[in-house]
A protein has these predicted regions:
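C-terminal core of ALDH-fold dehydrogenases
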Residues: 1-48, 353
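Flexible, low-hydrophobicity surface segments
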Residues: 70-222, 250, 328, 534
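Glycine-rich loop/linker segments at domain edges
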Residues: 77, 83-86, 151, 223-267, ...
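Alpha-helical support elements that line or immediately flank enzyme active sites
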Residues: 108-138, 174-193, 267-339, 395-407, ...
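Short, surface-exposed loop/turn segments at secondary-structure boundaries that line and modulate
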Residues: 136-170, 204-216, 285, 289, ...
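Beta-strand segments within the central parallel beta-sheet cores of soluble alpha/beta enzyme folds
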Residues: 138, 305-313, 340-350, 376-381, ...
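Phosphate/diphosphate-binding loops
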Residues: 171, 177-179, 337-387
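Helix-loop-helix junctions that connect adjacent transmembrane helices in secondary transporters/permeases
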Residues: 212-299, 471-559
Length: 616
């Protein structure tokens, strides 16, 4: 059971648990537990009703008072998705489908060691292969100062190393050839000599005084700690825990996980020496932001932002993994710039699975309560292993993302959270995976401890949540770690969810099976999440304020073209955006074309991730 407690959408639109007000000052805070939805100052009720279907499964049936006719197909109408036909007929256009005249292929040579000095890179055998045009190394890129690039959180990482590899699978050099098969042969022929060093892979040992300094390239870096962050009142929280009737403790490890989209990452870069412009086809969830970052990397060689055009075609799954700028992208772009021909790089599955990780959080949690289950205090101390660079996309104001939402949907007075992030000899960590800026880790911490408390005092997991929920009349509510919760009715929402799935029947079935020696688990999770990556006063990527834009053109025929700074990876923008516009303009949704993903035509926006834009 998942309870979307206070699911905020600053951008607005349709969220995964209901319809959010998307217009004007009401651009947030309206979901299934609310009594009504605001749209342009007009309130209508009810937004959502639930109808049980086929016993315990419980189908959510959304019933709206539709403003438009079925022919117009505005919000609330069940319509055919406009984008599905091309995918079902195999006519999707992905990055690997892009073919340009004279296009070359790139394959990357990667390090077999987690930590090693590069003694030499011998290109001769590779360059002797017919069809191999170039082998690009860090030394080659260093001549143009293109061998380093920023991450999304103001850290830095190598595009290609010049002397030291920092993690197994790190990019060492790239082979450019007339086709992929020849490029693979060339990569196998490159002879790299290494001097392996003892790798530092234990995040706890990374903080030892005698630990090797992994990032001496960073000015002022004296140890392997990236940052220390804390929020709340340590002393008052410790005192409340010490005085409590019941205290449960646990060290929770959320290990590294990886996005496994059907489509891996890829890029086609084409530099035109005549116009001095770079055209890039890219698997990107945030094309405009990536263009800005690439300009930061390559602006000094003439590739300023207005000379870079990024087109994000159809994307075969994003989940946060296609938000960052990966070294492979920059290498391909640099290769096209240096050679003067289009260069394609498509990550293979093996490469994909050894780069771009999320999580790796070690969380020491303490939850204190009265003997009858009323929570009094929560404390969590976290060690985050970010690998050799911090690849998080967190706002600069919140280096740990939204981890301070870890107090959850519960009412208690005292909380304290702290986090230490460290470097190790692992692939870059901190990449998003299906979460809004560390919310998943935060939710796991508090929910695991609430379940542990329920087991300790032998209380039903649902009952202990009801006992501790923020009450409807307490909103707006100030959390002990500084968040302002605008509205909600958590009790009613969980009650409805339990009714829909038949919770009481499941409990009876569980008891019967346990009597027979069988195991059956029932899981409950309730959470409050900050989503939408906004407003801009609080959220940014490398100083770029988080906002989004739209442009609508109505043709003389009465049809319309709408362009957005977002980018769909399956969210259904072509349908849902058209429905929203149909609602407002009265133009049939079938007559509204949605265009996004091209930085030359779409207005500037920060893309689609962390529940930004409209999932359907």
């Amino acid at each position: 059971l998942i309870h979307f407690g206070n699911y905020r959408l600053p951008f607005g639109g349709v969220g995964t648990s209901g319809i959010g007000a998307y217009h004007g000052k009401h651009g947030f805070d309206t979901f299934s537990h609310h009594k009504s939805i605001s749209k342009r100052g007009t309130w209508f009720d009810p937004p959502v009703r639930y109808a049980p279907y086929n016993g315990k499964l419980g189908l959510i049936k959304k019933m709206f008072k539709c403003k438009t006719s079925p022919e117009v197909g505005g919000m609330g109408h069940s319509v055919k998705r406009k984008e599905d036909a091309r995918f079902l007929h195999g006519k999707g256009n992905y990055t690997d489908d892009v073919k340009l005249p004279g296009m070359l292929s790139m394959v990357i040579v990667r390090s077999p060691y987690a930590y090693a000095k590069i003694l030499s890179i011998n290109k001769e055998k590779a360059l002797a292969i017919d069809g191999v045009l170039a082998v690009i190394t860090g030394e080659d890129l260093a001549q143009y100062n293109l061998h380093w690039m920023p991450t999304l959180l103001s850290d830095s990482q190598m595009v290609l190393p010049t002397d030291t590899v920092m993690h197994q699978s790190q990019e060492v050099c790239a082979v450019i050839a007339t086709d992929r098969y020849i490029a693979v042969d060339g990569a196998e022929a490159v002879d790299v000599q290494y001097e392996p060093m003892k790798a530092l892979v234990d995040p706890w040992k990374a903080l030892d005084d005698d630990a090797p300094l992994l990032r001496p390239d960073k000015e002022g870096q004296k140890d392997n700690q990236i940052y220390h962050w804390e929020r709340g009142e340590r002393e008052k929280t410790d005192a409340a825990i010490a005085a409590a009737d019941v205290v449960v403790k646990e060290r929770i490890h959320l290990p590294r996980i990886h996005v496994a989209s059907i489509e891996t990452c890829g890029v086609v870069a084409s530099y035109d020496k005549d116009t001095e412009k770079m055209l890039i086809y890219l698997t990107s969830q945030a094309p405009h932001a990536i263009r800005t970052i690439l300009a930061l990397v390559a602006g000094h060689v003439g590739l300023s932002e207005e000379k870079i055009r990024i087109i994000a075609p159809d994307i075969g799954g994003g989940f946060g993994g296609k938000v960052p700028v990966y070294p492979g992208y920059v290498i391909a772009i640099a290769a096209s710039f240096l050679i003067g021909k289009p260069v394609k790089w498509i990550e293979d599955r093996s490469e994909n699975l050894v780069n771009g990780f999320a999580r790796d959080y070690h969380m020491d949690c303490e939850l204190a309560a009265t003997k009858d289950g009323k929570i009094q205090a929560f404390k969590v101390s976290t060690l985050a292993d970010h690998g050799y660079t911090d690849s998080s996309a967190n706002p600069s104001k919140y280096p740990t993302g939204m981890f301070s939402i870890c107090t959850g949907s519960y009412d208690y007075e005292h909380a304290f959270a702290e986090l230490d992030a460290v470097y190790t000899n692992k692939a870059p960590g901190g990449v998003a995976y299906r979460c809004s800026f560390r919310v998943t880790e935060a939710v796991h911490a508090i929910e695991r401890m609430v379940d542990k408390l329920a087991a300790e005092i032998k209380m039903d997991p649902a009952e202990i949540r009801f006992k501790n929920f923020i009450k409807k009349e307490q909103f707006p509510y100030a959390s002990p770690l500084g968040w302002s919760y605008d509205s909600g009715d958590y009790k009613q929402t969980l009650e409805k969810a339990m009714e829909m799935v038949g919770y009481d029947d499941y409990k009876k079935e569980q008891a019967e099976k346990r009597a027979q020696g069988k195991l059956m688990g029932i899981g409950i999770c309730t959470f409050t999440e900050v989503v939408g990556a906004g407003p801009s006063k609080d959220f940014d990527i490398l100083g770029i304020a988080m906002f989004d834009s739209a442009e609508i053109r109505v043709h003389p025929t009465g049809k319309a073209l709408a362009r957005f700074g977002t980018k769909s990876q399956g969210q259904g923008h072509e349908t849902t955006y058209a429905q929203i516009l149909a609602e407002e303009l009265g133009i049939p949704y079938t007559d509204i074309e949605i265009d996004e993903g091209d930085t030359d035509t779409a207005p500037y926006g920060l893309g689609t991730y962390a529940s930004r834009s409209t999932p359907t």
